[in-house]
């Protein structure tokens, strides 16, 4: 019985120390609407580190890592080779339920925030983010310099869908911070999870989460909803429109 009480007390004390700092955050816009002429935008994440009496007196400097993840989906990266003057697909790798959008921001270089072991465990930096692949009949994440993984990240980065910036987080005061979240024109639709992790003297202190949503509006959304919810009606209307277009074209261009 005494051991159980001591264990419970230890858990309580650990929980109390873990709550020595509390993160309070918010996003400038929790619902982003995408119209046909949407060209991208930048959201602003801002927040503060709230201390309490149990915060160590010598803890005055903090580090922050912000991770933004879009809706997850299966994706494929293909290897092309030139044979007989023609580029053909020779191999491919499937990535399973990986973020369609992924951004990591910090207030200083990731390798100066914490140790490599903690960085791997907390997935700090693109090289440490888990990207599960189908390798033959197995599922695994591979080494960061794997050719398919490197190509996948490079292609997503070129489209503005994957990024990391070790200077994007700014501390306005020792405890008040902000960062921008750039969204490209082709940003995927869905719910985006934002995870904010707090470090001090290389140690992981705690984290908090928030989210925002990207939705289509207007005629595009109406068409998408109709196709998803009433597939038969959508197919019939599409076929009718195609027939009408062909009929009108035959009238306009027919020879008298």
Where are each of the predicted segments found?
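Sec/Tat signal peptide C-region and signal peptidase I cleavage site
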Residues: 16-20
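Short solvent-exposed capping/turn motifs at the termini of beta-strands
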Residues: 49-53
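Bacterial N-terminal signal peptides
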Residues: 7-15
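Juxtamembrane interface at the cytosolic side of transmembrane helices
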Residues: 232-256
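Membrane-proximal low-complexity regions enriched in glycine and acidic/polar residues
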Residues: 82-184, 188
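Extended, hydrophilic extramembrane loops/domains of integral membrane proteins
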Residues: 186-216
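Short, aromatic-rich amphipathic segments at membrane interfaces
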Residues: 182, 205-235
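N-terminal edge beta-strand
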Residues: 21-36
């Amino acid at each position: 019985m005494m051991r159980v009480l001591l264990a419970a007390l230890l858990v309580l004390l650990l929980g109390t120390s873990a709550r020595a700092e509390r993160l309070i955050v918010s996003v400038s816009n929790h619902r982003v609407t995408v119209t046909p002429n949407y060209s991208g935008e930048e959201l602003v994440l801002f927040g503060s580190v709230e201390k309490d009496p149990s915060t160590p007196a010598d803890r005055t400097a903090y580090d922050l890592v912000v991770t933004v993840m879009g809706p997850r989906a299966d994706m494929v990266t293909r290897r092309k080779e030139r044979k007989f003057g023609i580029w053909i697909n020779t191999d491919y790798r499937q990535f399973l339920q990986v973020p369609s959008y992924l951004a990591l921001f910090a207030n200083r270089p990731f390798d100066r925030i914490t140790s490599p072991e903690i960085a791997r465990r907390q997935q700090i930096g693109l090289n440490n983010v888990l990207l599960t692949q189908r390798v033959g009949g197995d599922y695994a994440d591979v080494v960061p310099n794997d050719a398919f993984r490197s190509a996948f990240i490079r292609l997503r980065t070129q489209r503005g869908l994957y990024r990391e910036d070790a200077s994007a987080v700014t501390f306005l005061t020792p405890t008040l911070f902000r960062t921008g979240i750039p969204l490209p024109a082709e940003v995927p639709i869905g719910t985006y999870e934002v995870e904010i992790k707090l470090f001090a003297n290389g140690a992981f202190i705690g984290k908090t989460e928030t989210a925002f949503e990207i939705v289509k509006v207007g005629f595009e959304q109406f068409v998408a909803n109709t196709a998803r919810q009433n597939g038969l009606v959508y197919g019939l209307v599409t076929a009718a429109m195609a027939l009408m277009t062909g009929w009108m074209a035959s009238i306009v261009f027919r020879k008298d």
